Structures are given as structure tokens and as C-alpha cells.
């Protein structure tokens, strides 16, 4: 069983974990090509491309200008990424066994790096998968990455001994690997969905759902979950599996108020 999640926009490069190894991303060469293209943009053009404020555009411009392939300014992405999903994961509560299990069973999709193992070193960056970066006959980042990510993930899924892919990524990122189960029909995709009961109906509450995704990652990694039936036992912070709302592909977990 392999889990995929989205990266975070918020980064923390102040923390250093020297007890964990730092590995090279699989698609470092492809990331470098993107960075070299983005270095051609001034901060104003970068802001228009990414729809960011002047302050953030300047920060991103500076990040791309100093980006390099060495580990000089890198952190393991599992440590560097912050945000609601990663808050829910609470990596600081993982023991060393949990962390190494996570490195084998979690993948983080990325606009710049394609797909990351948790121990992969990354430089500070921001490049969302949905960014309409058009260059060298590529229409956008989805076109750039095409099937590369799918083939990498098929290999990683099979290495776990269970052909289930647990999709805890946003649609923007999952779209980059959509059709992986067509490319390899042995792959079974399940998507956990988190809803809260409000005003007489179950609704997805975005911020809570993001945190719940992180909670589920933590649940899977700490309990070494490797099958769907055990996945349904997720019960952190009041969520429970709702069989009535679920089907074979979508596992719905609900929170009652």
C-alpha cells in the first residue's frame, strides 16, 4: 500500500534533522530544467504566472535564482513541508521506525520535483502543479510530467507488496497521476473523503479535511496499515468510517457534532 499527498506551500527550513538520511529526488534533472526556465522570469512575470503577491513573487524569484542540486540548503521534504496536512501528520511524534516506514510507503507529489520520497532533499521553492507554465512545446506542468510520475509510482506501489494506492492528495495534484490504474490495471485506487455533519447534512469542511488527511497518514504509518479493511478502522479525533456513504473507490469518514 502506497499513500500519495500534496506538498505544502508553507516551508520551514530552520529545523535540521541530522539523524535521518537525505536522498536525491528521482527527477532532479527534470526539476533543474524547470528551474532554468523559471529563472528567465522577473519577479513581476513570476507573480502573474503564479498569481502571488509582490512580496511572495520576489521571494520566489530569489529562491529560483539560488536553487542548486547540492544539499547545501536542502532539508528532507518530510521535515521542510508545513501546512494543514503536515500539521495533522505531526511528524515530530514519529519514532525512527515510523519514519523509515513512511519513507517506504508515502510519496509527495510536487510541481517542481514531480514526486518525492519523504527523505528526499529539497531547496526552498514554490511551484504548484496547476501552474500554467508553457515552454518547449509543453502546454503546462501536467504535460511536462506526463506518464513519468505514473511509472515511478507503479514501481513504488508494487514494492510495498500490496497494489493499493491511497489517494490523500488534492485533485490539482492527483490529476498528474490520473489514469495510473489504466496504465497498470492491477493498481487499485482508494480515496478517503472526510465530512462533517452540519445543518442536517454531511459536508466537506476544507481546512478540517486537510488536517484529517494528515491524521490518516499518521494513522497508516504508525500502525503499519497495509490493507483497506484496516484503513477503515481510522478513528482519530472523532472520525469514523461511514459505510452508507462509501463505495469501493471512495472511503467516507464522518465527524458528528
Curated annotation (Swiss-Prot):
GO cellular component: cytosol
The organism's place on the tree of life at top rank: Bacteria
GO biological process, one term: response to hydroperoxide
Family: Belongs to the UPF0246 family.
Record PANTHER family: PEROXIDE STRESS RESISTANCE PROTEIN YAAA, PEROXIDE STRESS RESPONSE PROTEIN YAAA
NCBIfam families: PRK02101.1-3
Protein known as: UPF0246 protein CLL_A2361
Source organism of the structure: Clostridium botulinum (strain Eklund 17B / Type B)
Lineage of the organism: Bacteria, Bacillati, Bacillota, Clostridia, Eubacteriales
